[in-house]
A protein has these predicted regions:
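Short helix-adjacent coil turns
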Residues: 109, 113-120
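C-terminal motif of bacterial Sec signal peptides marking the signal peptidase cleavage site
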Residues: 13-17
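Alpha-helical segments in soluble extracytoplasmic regions
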Residues: 28-107, 123-127, 131-138
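Short, solvent-exposed mixed-charge patches
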Residues: 113, 142-143
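Bacterial signal peptide processing site
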Residues: 18-23
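Bacterial N-terminal signal peptides that target proteins for export
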Residues: 1-8
């Protein structure tokens, strides 16, 4: 996990040295979104496997806790960006909202699993799917 964070930060630092301000922000958005999308998908998979009785509650809870930390790291990394044009400001607001939505869904799952409430965790599956889809679109920005 720390290695992935270090790689992500190094990538952002390297990308910050080249390109226009809008391109730099798109690259940072894409990197953060890809990282968060992975964690959201991990959370979704944990809930689905728990529902199918292929995973223990305790293991699922730990997986989701780790995923929540990953989403928080991605969101924090992106929120440190400084948009400098109207275009980059709009992108910043959109990406920040999408990351916040993902973080909210993953946190809701963690809380539900901590309360041994699989039904409440399952209610987050549509939000997790939508977040993964939205983050995937953002993740394609720098490609």
């Amino acid at each position: 996990m720390r290695r992935a964070v270090a790689i992500m930060l190094l990538t952002i630092l390297i990308l910050s040295g080249c390109g226009s301000p809008d391109q730099k922000l798109r690259s940072a958005a894409a990197q953060s979104a890809r990282s968060a999308a992975s964690e959201v998908s991990t959370t979704r998979l944990a809930v689905e496997q728990l529902r199918a009785q292929r995973l223990w509650t305790r293991s699922a809870g730990q997986i989701v806790k780790d995923a929540e930390k990953g989403v928080e790291t991605a969101a924090s990394s992106f929120s440190a960006q400084q948009p400098s044009t109207p275009t980059s400001t709009r992108l910043y607001e959109q990406v920040t909202k999408t990351l916040d939505d993902a973080q909210t869904a993953v946190t809701a799952v963690r809380i539900a699993l901590g309360n041994d409430d699989l039904a409440a965790a399952e209610q987050q599956l549509p939000a997790l799917r939508q977040s993964a889809k939205d983050l995937g679109r953002i993740g394609e920005l720098a490609q």
